[in-house]
């Protein structure tokens, strides 16, 4: 309640999100406290959790995070997953029943992709969730937006550079 998320720095956002995602007890969120967009996003995650409970973990594939501009964008998705019990810490072990993949689409995002992934993988909570999900991190690199953004040559070069740096991680 006393944390101004919109005004916070990226480092502070990431730290706070990690604390919320890593909290042992589920955080209760009243739908009445949310705006329409947040309520709709949480409803999607509730549906995902319900489907997993009814059908099994394999009911849906990777959750792609379009236009990932920062590490906090990925952790925000994991917070939604945590709110419905798809990931977190149960007091003994970490669990993660959702695979998330950042999608880097613009030239700027492609250039920042290594730093963003390094931030995520250096975060203890995120790293624990990746480990609980089989130590597998999927990453997507977009072509069309980076091409619109910087042209064909810049797009291809930045895609190539992003691939090299991500593989090195």
Describe each PLM feature range:
Residues 25-36, 56-67, 95-106, 142-154:
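Glycine- and acidic
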Residues 76-89, 101, 105-169:
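Active-site capping/gating regions of soluble enzymes
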């Amino acid at each position: 309640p006393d944390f101004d998320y919109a005004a916070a720095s990226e480092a502070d956002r990431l730290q706070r999100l990690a604390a919320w995602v890593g909290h042992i007890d589920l955080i209760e969120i009243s739908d009445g406290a949310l705006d329409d967009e947040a309520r709709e996003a949480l409803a999607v995650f509730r549906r995902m959790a319900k489907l997993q409970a009814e059908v099994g973990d394999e009911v849906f594939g990777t959750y792609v995070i379009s236009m990932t501009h920062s590490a906090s964008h990925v952790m925000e998705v994991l917070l939604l997953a945590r709110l419905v019990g798809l990931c977190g810490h149960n007091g003994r072990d970490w669990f993660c029943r959702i695979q998330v993949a950042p999608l880097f689409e613009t030239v700027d995002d492609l250039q920042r992709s290594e730093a963003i992934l390094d931030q995520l993988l250096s975060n203890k909570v995120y790293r624990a969730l990746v480990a609980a999900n089989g130590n597998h991190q999927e990453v997507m690199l977009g072509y069309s937006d980076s091409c619109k953004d910087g042209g064909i040559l810049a797009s291809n070069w930045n895609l190539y550079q992003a691939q090299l740096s991500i593989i090195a991680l």
